[in-house]
Amino acid sequence: MIDREQIVRIVSDYLSTGETFLVEVAIHPGNRILVELDSAQGVCIDECVALSRHIESQVDRDLEDYELEVGSTGLTSPLKVMRQWENCIDSELSVLLTNGMKETGRLITVAPEAIKLEVVRMVKPEGAKRKKPETQELTIVMADIKQAVRII
């Protein structure tokens, strides 16, 4: 069985000097290795090919055969690591909470323990007949977030 930690080390060492960063390494049955990358500017195919070749040069296919797939996370893929959150500041997000509620708004700040979203709520001012849009800041604890994706 291919060691996930070995792949993480190889990828992390390779990416340590650039803007591209590791999001996830998954090893599926049949030694199918999936490596997901991301970057503020996006990940080009040349970076994926170069990293794939680097991994193949470090992991001996003769000892144990494997299938390797290196790619970028999609624009609408869920956010998984802190650097992805940081790259999404000032972007619109859809955040699904663990209680089933969904919040949509512009990401203002992010910290390891919580995020702050700017959301628009329809509020009825006192004495008014209709609701009017009102911008509010909403703090959401990371532990309460089930999934968050960018809105394009």
UniProtKB/Swiss-Prot annotation:
<dbReference type="GO" id="GO:0005829">
    <property type="term" value="C:cytosol"/>
</dbReference>
<comment type="similarity">
    <text>Belongs to the RimP family.</text>
</comment>
<protein>
    <recommendedName>
        <fullName>Ribosome maturation factor RimP</fullName>
    </recommendedName>
</protein>
<dbReference type="Pfam" id="PF02576">
    <property type="entry name" value="RimP_N"/>
</dbReference>
<dbReference type="InterPro" id="IPR003728">
    <property type="entry name" value="Ribosome_maturation_RimP"/>
</dbReference>
<dbReference type="GO" id="GO:0006412">
    <property type="term" value="P:translation"/>
</dbReference>
<dbReference type="InterPro" id="IPR035956">
    <property type="entry name" value="RimP_N_sf"/>
</dbReference>
<comment type="function">
    <text>Required for maturation of 30S ribosomal subunits.</text>
</comment>
<dbReference type="GO" id="GO:0000028">
    <property type="term" value="P:ribosomal small subunit assembly"/>
</dbReference>
<keyword id="KW-0963">Cytoplasm</keyword>
<dbReference type="InterPro" id="IPR028989">
    <property type="entry name" value="RimP_N"/>
</dbReference>
<keyword id="KW-0690">Ribosome biogenesis</keyword>
